[in-house]
Every structure is written in structure tokens, then in C-alpha cells.
Amino acid sequence: MIEALYKFTKSHNQFHDRYDETKHKRIEIKFSTVMKANESVINRSNAIDQCKKANLGNRALSSDDMYNYNFDCNIQQVKRAEFDFLYYGLFFADKIAIFQMSSDEIQSCFGYSDKQHKGNEGEGQFHLNRKSIDYHMKNHFVQWLTYEELYNLLSNL
């Protein structure tokens, strides 16, 4: 999707996803599906009921509701030294939000932590959720893409 939208080419090595031949920049791509948080904490007495409810059909979140419901999308295994630009996004029920930030901007990204795993240096993560979505929309939002537009984009490859 990102390759087709922005005319990127295949990566030059295994450490990034695509390459921008025009700007000579390494591109990393990370996306997450947005689902409403569970209504209840899962425990022994409600585990079966929670499993029945834990499907995308019941928990898919529309973009119109991103400020109304709790959700948590983790953009992880972010290795800033391995790319120049990160394209990241959210698959909402009705459309896709696409964001972009430079590797230099990630260090100051709302909620970024460079300590994803014990002893794992140079790799971090950040969350997009009800508390942080406004930061991403104001500072890093690139575009909305409907699923029909995505279908047409991919059909024309």
C-alpha cells in the first residue's frame, strides 16, 4: 500500500521495508488494526464470554469514534538507526489513517520508549490510543485512505 501510494521501491537491505529513490531515503512501514478495548477485564469466570466477544466484528472501531472509545495500538520494534522515515498507520473499520515521521522525530514522539525489551538497545515502541491520537493527528497525519481507494490502488498494480 505505502509502496504503491508513494512510488517507493524495494528495500536496499533487510533492515528497512522500502526505499525512496527520489529522496534517497530508507523507509520503514508499520501498521496496526484498531479495536475497541475489552469492556471487562478477562478472568476465569468470564473468559469464554470474552473470547466470544473478542472478534473484529464486535470490536472494530470506526474512525469517527477514535476519541470516544479506548483502544491501544502498539508500533513496536522501531529501530531508528535503520531508516530515515517511518510510515505508520491505523486500520479503522471504515478507513485507514496514514502517518509519517522522520527517525529524528521519533525520540520526541509522545509516549516513545526506547526500552522495548530488556537489554535491547536501539529498538523502541510507541502507542497510539485515545490519549495519544490527537498528538499524531496534529503532528504526523498524512492522509486518509478508504478501503475502496485501497482496493483500486492495489487493483491497478
Ranges and model annotations:
Residues 1-16, 21-22, 31-157:
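Nucleic-acid endonuclease domains
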Residues 26-28:
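Short hydrophobic-acidic sequence motifs that mark active-site Asp/Glu residues
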